Amino acid sequence: MKMLNSRKIRMERRIVGATNRWRFPQDHFCGDLLALSQMCNVLNVDLDDALKNPDKLCISKFQKLFTESIMDSGTQSGEADVILDCLGFKWELHHPQIFQSETLAKLYLTALIQNTKSSQRDLEKILKVHSTERMKKRSPVKKIIISLRINDPAVTRVAFALALKNLYMNEVEMTVDNVLGVLASAHILQFNRLFRKCVSTMLNRLTPCTIKNFYLAGCKYKEEQLTNACEKWLAMNLVPLVGTQIHLRHIPEPLLYKVLKSPRLFTFSEFHLLKTLLMWVYLQMNGKVQTLPIHETMLAFFSSFPKKSCFLEQDPGHSWMPLFLCLRLHGITSGKDLEEIKHINFFPESWLVRVTANHYHALESGGNMVHLKDLSTQAMRFGLLFRQEYTTYSETISIYGYFFEIKGIKHDTTSYSFSMQRIRHTDLECPSSVCEHSTISLRSERLVKYEIRAQTLVDGRWQEFGTNQIMQKFGFIKPGCKSHALKIQTVGIPIYASFAFIFPAS
């Protein structure tokens, strides 16, 4: 049964200026209707329009009148018009600067309207002062004191001072150390120009030590441009850069999950990606560790857990199961690597049995990966990080007895090409990582479905290049042994080149 409130909305008496007037307490306007009417007369604004959104209307009018060439002419001299009480300090401000901040403008207009007796006279004085450029000395306007309470711990006095300084100057330098505080200050002040400037600064300063805080700031303020940039940057740098530093510990789990699911993710191999993710888990469980351990130390740690069940089926490992479901364990084909995975008792036995069975069937059928259908989500991934000092760079990979060389070539200062080529096992110098315990296929041809992609950062924007998905038979004799080449023109460096392929049934 619905209860009805029989109590009618009462009007309350409030003294505004020298009069005694009625108003509804639920009214959206912070003063009263007569005061609003007075302001509309001064500003030459239609009262009906003002009633729809009085705060926004008044602020926009003042902004239009006050934000002129003062921003380009340096700081303003003269006596302050407004005293801002905030963070235990009293900050002296001027009208043209106040109206760049919606928060300060609302506080100021509220205080001005509620000030005793002279709301209309003060408005007329302010408008008169700023309407004539020839006027060198302003008429005295009574100083208004406004207060702003800030509870955000990110806003320090130094950061807030920098934010207020940006009201007066276009070029105020921000560092990585204070940009988050200035961003928080700009958000509270509703100072859009400064907020965009902070975001731009953060976009250009993504590093292993800033990625966490910048991403969380993007989430906090719902700034999609910043969160997307963090995701793209980490997708490229998780394995080659962040995974080699202690900052890996601070990557938030939601961000890590998004990156692992990203089709743009760069990795040297599936096993490199697995090692990076294992290291992240190790660092979550060993908070006092200040440097990355060697690989053997990490393996010994996971091997020390009870053998009654695997790590991912125990606490806290179970909570990280979604992360490891993103991996393509079928892309790890080295017997040594698979034995290592089995030894640490990290994954459910059913996962390892399925991977081993798929490898067995692929070897038995000459390399056919009948269990893989979708190149974009199931392909085996390999990568080259082409650095500035390289003119040619290549790596050799072995899968089910087939050997391929993935290669990048620099043709001139801005021209590059990336390709893959099938090679004979007899052409190898047999580095242990490729030849040791490898099977050798005697098949003269191998059907391969592949795609080559390259990405690089230029002026804060990612350039992306790629071939289509290509189906090709690889033999040993040119030109049949070589893939299509991905040719690109870019000034970006380094270049992240990714090779994805599967062996369809043939």
From Swiss-Prot:
UniProt name for this protein:
BTB/POZ domain-containing protein 16
Which organism is this protein's natural source?
A: Rattus norvegicus (Rat)
UniProt cross-references to Pfam families, sorted A to Z: BTB_BTBDG, BTBD16_C
InterPro entries named among the record's database cross-references: BTB_BTBDG, BTBD16, BTBD16_C, SKP1/BTB/POZ_sf
Matches recorded under PANTHER family: BTB/POZ DOMAIN-CONTAINING PROTEIN 16, BTB_POZ DOMAIN-CONTAINING PROTEIN 16
Q: Which domain of life is it from?
A: Eukaryota
Please state every residue range assigned to the domain named BTB: 150-206
